[in-house]
Amino acid sequence: MEKQSNDAAVAGAPNDHGAAKCPVAHTAHGRRNRDWWPDALDISTLHRNSSLSDPMGSGFDYAMEFESLDLQAVIKDLHALMTDSQDWWPADFGHYGGLMIRMAWHSAGTYRITDGRGGAGAGQQRFAPLNSWPDNANLDKARRLLWPVKQKYGDKISWADLMVLAGNVALESMGFKTFGFAGGRSDVWEPEELYWGPEGTWLGDERYSGERQLSEPLGAVQMGLIYVNPEGPNGNPDPVAAAKDIRETFFRMAMNDEETVALIAGGHTFGKTHGAGDPSLVGPDPESGALEDQGLGWKSKFGTGFGADAITGGPEVTWSQTPTQWSNSFFKNLFENEWELTNSPAGAKQWRAKNGQATIPDPFDKSKKRVPTMLTTDLSLRFDPAYEKISRRFYENPDQFADAFARAWFKLTHRDMGPIARYLGPLVPKETLLWQDPIPPVDHPLIDENDASALKAKILASGLSTSDLVSTAWASASTFRGSDKRGGANGARIRLAPQKDWEVNQPKQLAKVLEKLETIGKEFGKKVSLADLIVLGGDAAIEKAAKDAGVEVKIPFTPGRMDASQEQTDVASFAPLEPKADGFRNYIGRKTQFLQPEEALVDRAQLLRLTGPEMTVLVGGLRVLGANTAGSKHGVFTATPGVLTNDFFVNLLDMRTHWQPAGGEEGVYEGRDRKTNALKWTGTRVDLIFGSHSQLRAFAEVYAWAGSKEKFVKDFAAAWNKVMNLDRYDVARTGETKKAAVV
């Protein structure tokens, strides 16, 4: 293909020179649709990481491959790797432990509880932008060091699992006892397009408002950092001010003060930072590097560029006298020295012990010693009052520190894995932890097909409406987040705080529905969980609504959900799952929302792992079924609500209707008859986007066709069933789907 110049005209436009041009739009040549219409709704996130980019094939089962792996052999190879220093990137102190810990930490540390995105679960550190973030400088070397191990074991261990395991083995190889390890993180094969911030430059910080209020859903203080600036806020070496940043960013990663102190102190017991010289001598990141660099970035012209001359960031700090051995030296140095501000050889602000003795080893010259040094953010653990109490307790009680770090490290590296049902391997801890959102195991015989049919009949005869049943089932299941695998219908946490009190769930109406379903369950001859009844009720209502529309449909039902208790539910941890907006229910909350309603719809659809067509058919179906929050009539484009027709699409695309903004209510539109101007419908931005956005309109047209009534119902039922079962990892693991399914 001929290379186009940067000022080339739009693809396909006449060319004065008559030269042939490549018909495929490339990023560097010519403009893309996004360049011409930057404000257009982007639904491309719904179609990423599909089978089209997966080289493993549709039949590949990573869980099966991992469980066939000789994990101890991998661990043995990783132990050997730790001290096998390579000339092209020599190991500090003869041990790669510190580097591997940093790699694992930074893989997991992108996790943010606000939307569950980031984290170690998909191996995204291999791809841009994470592979080229300033805070991830030289972690490309860590992954290259791991390549022989990955190459040896191939598809039996993912990069995502291997990076976390390498961090664990690094800790174990340096004398620390970890809490455990679970495999099960499947790799993805293309970068995830996430919102990492509004800035257009590395280390920019346009993400604040008011009194340093960090905007949601972000979890780091600057573009390209994992957490905080180690030199202090915007380079201001103030440990107390830095503590505020630390607390906020770690909180957004679901860590409390004790876990935060344990992680910082535990991680900084090992290894060092690298600021040997002028950072301007460091070359481009991996994504910006030359072809011949083969994906390695940050090539430095300072000295040898590695080893004693390595430059990763700015500070040059070693925290411990034994940087390759677990100890309490971090706290000993922190509390038993007074600190004075200084600069690293790279010019970064850091701290050194006043009148300190040279007791810290040099990473490459055993004859040399250094004075103890600390980062501004390390001193926060001493000078912030709350952190100081915890730090001093850890200093005086090393066993408490070790236990706290082991638990916090496990949480850090497993927080985005979801329920224990996803955990694989012989090193999974036996102890159940509250942050894992535990659900009791099945303790009773499950209902069969006849039972399910009988229960459906009782539910439909209970007086509960189609709207009641569909809304409740959707509210329960749609809390699922494919990002960190949390939420979903299993556990029936919709009956517990905080979900039972969320505005979007209409608490008073919800309580009435749940009470009736619980009564039906108690009066039935067999034990059945409320979680199963909620889903079964939604299924029954949809099947009836479809039948009323003249279409027979059966939604597969797989029993086995259980009911969690309030004691098994961390209220604060579940609070971020509350929808600020839910376009499927035409709900826009009163809380601050940084997205337009239609953008929030796509965001939620992506968390639900829906495709564009699935999102489209669900919105259209839920509207006519009356699932809107508070019974809103916006988008209910039908004369027969409660009947599963394709009326939403037919009436939205009807050219006899014209649309205009409604007076007095932002984001609401009136659909009026073109001839008489009589009001026919009202709709929101979410409703009208399916007629305005060209791709969504194309999907909508499919369901508005005269002969598509049956297709609409079948597609809606399939998408509905998908959402109801997104969290059924227990079924996926045991392979019981077909065996237990009620058709």
UniProtKB/Swiss-Prot annotation:
Quaternary data: Homodimer or homotetramer.
Keyword annotations of the record: Heme, Hydrogen peroxide, Iron, Metal-binding, Oxidoreductase, Peroxidase
Organism: Solibacter usitatus (strain Ellin6076)
EC supergroup of this enzyme: oxidoreductase
Active site: H106 (proton acceptor)
Matching PANTHER family: CATALASE-PEROXIDASE (PTHR30555:SF0), HYDROPEROXIDASE I, BIFUNCTIONAL CATALASE-PEROXIDASE (PTHR30555)
UniProt-listed Enzyme Commission number(s): 1.11.1.21
Cross-link (Tryptophyl-tyrosyl-methioninium (Tyr-Met) (with W-105)): Y227-M253
Record PTM: Formation of the three residue Trp-Tyr-Met cross-link is important for the catalase, but not the peroxidase activity of the enzyme.
Cofactor requirements of the protein: heme b
Linked residues for Tryptophyl-tyrosyl-methioninium (Trp-Tyr) (with M-253): W105-Y227
Function: Bifunctional enzyme with both catalase and broad-spectrum peroxidase activity.
GO cellular component: cytosol
Region feature Disordered, mapped onto this chain: 1-22
Cofactor-binding details, from the entry: Binds 1 heme b (iron(II)-protoporphyrin IX) group per dimer.
UniProt GO BP: cellular response to hydrogen peroxide; hydrogen peroxide catabolic process
Protein known as: Catalase-peroxidase
